[in-house]
A protein has these predicted regions:
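C-terminal functional modules
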Residues: 400-537
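Membrane-proximal, proline-rich intrinsically disordered regions
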Residues: 29-80, 85-86, 92-95, 103, ...
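Short, compositionally biased low-complexity segments
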Residues: 25-34, 70-77, 135-145, 265, ...
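Structured, solvent-exposed acidic/aromatic patches
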Residues: 72-126, 130-408, 446-451, 459
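Bacterial Sec-dependent N-terminal signal peptides
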Residues: 1-38
């Protein structure tokens, strides 16, 4: 028995040694495999500044898209390039961008070791910016339970009221964090394409943070303006929050001029303006200005009409006669619109401004003219004290500055009648007096009356032209100013929709919460003609 046990022990040692050898071999192979499987060209982590740059490039709404058609600034008159009908389906929501923002926050915390950093401050603003814009499209949204990935794939919907309250809180936190970073002279910001890396007039990282703080508070005032129809709801504190900003400029700095705008700047090498010299032959005659925009300018004898449009020479007036600047009703059928444009009876895009190069004009996301009009509107509505006329005037003056309109002689340039090729222009000298312009009964501020409010809203609408996404449409939806034109060309039986439907995949990925949200808001019908909460209807 003892001999047998000794043999068994020998066998056990042999097997144990063999097993250890195999384990060591496998361990060695695994280590080598891990080493070989790591791609040295693939980063293990993405720096927060690269994530920020990615997010910032995703937030502009560029001109010549559907948004400016739906805001009735421009029209398509040729079927190949689409039409002027309003949407009939769902919105595109930016939850993917929001997830990138969350990743940026985590990476910034990992690399800086602090929850207070430029990326965290901008993340709060960007979240508010995106959630507000998404809610303006559809209504209620997943927010407080969103962005948790697999931890919660079916988040509940926050009411639109909750979305706005949470967004206003994010903006407050962003302002506070930015103030602290500025006070500590933080210079760690990178990847900011709008201020720190701006093509013309780039700012230092610290100066960029100061610009961003102004943007945050100016956007906050826009958010409050969107709540005008529900401003009496005490939970929103609309008047108080507006007053807080305007009464404490050191705590809540706001935009002070066009140079403070949050805007997208174009360049010829890449990121060209959508209408440019390369596509002159494709669409210059197949796109025209909308009556809601250019006819308003013409009626006011506003020189911006000659800066943005070509004269309608088929009408028989002089090139610099305001009667030559006529847009099409957005409700007109395409065939009729195309014939009118072809016969020179509609104003096309100004060739010199939009097709002579590749950089036309910057695209605002949060602009100084709008800010001025927002403050004027708040004063007119009695939310805050102040001089509405002064802010109204500043808004108009800044708009003329943007378009290069000055007191005295102005040069306006159009394509020459019978032009033989690109660049064949004719220029005129046209006098302009801001004092005379502002003295017109339709422009001179009527005071804090309904007429005065309509004047503010009209000029604010003009300031949204070809920028600021759907803000022109949202203002019409909120106030009815200006009057939008409808017909067969706008679709939807001549009715302008009030919202977008939710993305169709919500019905399959989050059905219970989706159905509950649609039921509570719209009686179970995800209808584009239904009014959302903030419209107060």
């Amino acid at each position: 028995m003892l001999g047998i046990k000794n043999n068994e022990m020998k066998n056990f040692k042999f097997y144990t040694t063999a097993l250890l050898a195999v384990i060591l071999l496998l361990s060695s192979c695994s280590k080598q495999f891990d080493e070989y499987s790591v791609n040295p060209n693939k980063p293990l982590a993405v720096p927060p500044y690269l994530l920020l740059r990615n997010v910032l490039t995703s937030i502009p709404v560029f001109p010549d898209g559907d948004e400016e058609r739906w805001s009735q600034f421009t029209c398509r008159n040729y079927t190949y390039y689409g039409n002027n009908q309003y949407w009939s389906g769902s919105a595109t929501l930016q939850y993917g961008t929001l997830n990138t923002i969350v990743a940026m926050e985590k990476e910034a915390l990992r690399t800086t070791g602090s929850e207070t950093n430029p990326y965290a401050a901008l993340a709060k603003f960007l979240k508010a910016y995106i959630f507000v814009n998404m809610s303006l499209k559809v209504g209620d949204l997943p927010m407080s339970e969103a962005l948790q990935g697999l931890a919660n794939p079916t988040p509940k919907y926050d009411t639109q009221k909750q979305v706005f309250i949470q967004s206003l809180q994010l903006l407050e936190e962003s302002n506070t964090m930015l103030a602290g970073l500025i006070n500590n002279a933080d210079v760690s910001l990178q990847g900011d394409i709008y201020f720190q890396e701006k093509i013309s007039g780039a700012s230092t990282p610290l100066e960029a943070l100061k610009h961003w703080q102004k943007v945050v508070n100016s956007f906050k005032l826009r958010v409050l303006i969107h709540l005008s129809n529900v401003a009496t709801d005490g939970d929103l504190k609309v008047s108080q929050l507006f007053t807080d900003v305007l009464s404490n400029s050191s705590k809540y700095p706001i935009l002070e001029g066009l140079s403070d705008n949050l805007e997208f700047e174009y360049n010829q090498a890449y990121n060209q303006y959508p209408n440019n010299a390369s596509n002159l032959g494709n669409d210059a005659t197949r796109l025209n200005l909308a009556a809601t925009w250019v006819n308003t300018l013409s009626d006011l004898h506003d020189l911006r009409a000659m800066k943005v449009g070509e004269p309608s020479r088929g009408l028989g007036y002089e090139d610099t006669d305001f009667r030559s600047f006529v847009g099409s009703s957005s409700g007109l059928d395409l065939s009729t619109m195309y014939d009118l444009a072809g016969n020179g009876k509609l104003s096309l895009y100004n060739r010199k401004r939009y097709y002579d190069g590749y950089t036309a004009e910057n695209t605002f996301m949060v602009g100084y003219p709008e800010l001025c009009f927002n403050i004027a509107e708040a004063i007119n509505r009695g939310w805050v004290s102040g001089d509405a006329e002064s802010w109204y005037r500043k808004g108009i003056e800044s708009e003329f500055e943007f378009y290069g309109v000055v007191d005295g002689d102005n040069t306006v340039t159009f394509v020459r009648s019978g032009a033989t090729g690109p660049g064949d222009y004719i220029s005129y000298t046209v006098p302009f007096s801001f004092t005379e312009y502002f003295a017109q009964p339709a422009v001179a501020y009527d005071g804090n009356t309904e007429t005065g409010l309509n004047q503010i809203l009209t000029q604010k609408y003009l300031a949204f032209a070809r920028n600021s996404g759907l803000e022109g449409y949202y203002q019409w939806r909120r106030t009815g100013v200006p009057e939008f034109l409808t017909g067969s060309g706008t679709g939807n039986s001549g009715v302008i929709p009030l919202r977008f439907q939710y993305p169709s995949d919500e019905l399959s990925t989050n059905p219970t919460n989706y159905k509950a949200a649609v039921q509570s808001q719209y009686g179970g019908d995800d209808n584009i003609n239904a009014a959302m909460w903030l419209l107060g209807r």
